[in-house]
């Protein structure tokens, strides 16, 4: 519910929304709820395409005591690194894409009154937010994500997903 609440801070009923989505949903509020659910679902999806980093952790009890290492790998996903700032960036990207689409419609002489923010803008913004970041997340962020996931131990290595 946290991500949906944050999306809801930035996606409000006073924004121009895709008219077809509002009509299909039956109301502006219902359209926003569906858009937010789709964006949050994409942000937190745990699929091969949303893998963001692979961490190898040594969870042996005493490091350096001669005990054999107990190595395990953990895939971290985009959602593991989501924050309020990331969600705001996603919404800002979606807004810019919708504005650009509206300007293109106006330039082409088309009726742009039905053009507004839609699910497609949000889903593309989720994808772009993480694909534009070419570097792996900083080690403290990776350690925090592992801790939140309940993984304990010494971080041995971090690699991009394959």
Predicted feature locations:
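C-terminal engagement/docking regions of AAA+ P-loop ATPases
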Residues: 61-162
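Conserved C-terminal "switch" segment of AAA+ ATPases
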Residues: 1-87, 96-105
């Amino acid at each position: 519910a946290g991500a949906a609440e944050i999306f809801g801070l930035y996606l409000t009923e006073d924004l121009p929304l895709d008219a077809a989505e509002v009509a299909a949903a039956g109301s502006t509020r219902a359209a926003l709820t569906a858009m937010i659910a789709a964006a949050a679902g994409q942000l937190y999806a745990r699929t091969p395409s949303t893998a963001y980093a692979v961490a190898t952790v040594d969870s042996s009890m005493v490091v350096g005591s001669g005990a054999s290492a107990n190595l395990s790998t953990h895939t971290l996903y985009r959602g593991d690194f989501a924050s309020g700032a990331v969600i705001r960036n996603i919404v800002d990207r979606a807004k810019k894409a919708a504005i650009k689409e509206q300007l293109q419609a106006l330039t082409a002489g088309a009726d742009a009154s039905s053009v507004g923010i839609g699910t497609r803008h949000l889903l593309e913004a989720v994808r772009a937010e993480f694909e534009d970041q070419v570097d792996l997340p900083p080690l403290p962020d990776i350690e925090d994500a592992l801790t939140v996931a309940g993984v304990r131990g010494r971080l041995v290595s971090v690699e991009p997903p394959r």
